[in-house]
Amino acid sequence: MDVLRDVAAGKLVPASFQRPYVWRGPDVEAFWTSITKEWPIGSILIWEPDASVDVSRVGRTRLGPIEPAGEPKGIILDGQNRLATFAWSLRMPGDPMPDLSLLSEAEREVWGSKQLFVFDTHERRARFAHEDEVMGEHLIVPAGIVHDSTKLWPFIRKREKQIDISDEAITWLDHFGKAVRSAQCTTTILDRASPADALDAFRHIARVGVPMSEQDFADAMAWALEDAPAAPSL
């Protein structure tokens, strides 16, 4: 999925009005279960503003542990917990961690102690593991790289110098790589849309299940929405 490549490349950040990351361990496990069973994982709404919009003013500074290298191209209006979870799942042993004081309570609980979500070829299951365990006596692979051969195979080649890896383990991993690559997610991209267009899309597409009001959205982006209508009273 292109959106996952954009996450890995640091091209997407949550909208500034979004509440902090709130998923806990069971939510992460359910997310990866849906992917591995090839069930739909919901929808994502991304705004790619036109050149008149200062992305740094309407977006946050990072998605999970990933900070953009340069100006991000997209603002996540809906689906930030799913994409932030995938971003956290990309972490490799030894990768730098954000300052813990900058993480939400849920991020500190789930990821702050250098936990990774992994595919364990020995136990044949997906689970949480401390990053030190990933470099132990069995092949344990961070979940976020199983679909990307440019990251997966260098990791496997490195581990082959340290441990024995069976063909069955590789076959087991390959199944999950295919599942991630075929993940069913509806992605709507508002390409070069104005802030007013983004607000309109938010009202009509992301109304159900979005944990903020239209007024929250309008307030967060008011600097760029001088001509936008006020949010209706309820």
Task: Tell what function each PLM region has.
Residues 1-25, 29-234:
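Basic- and aromatic-enriched surface patches that contact anionic nucleotides/nucleic acids
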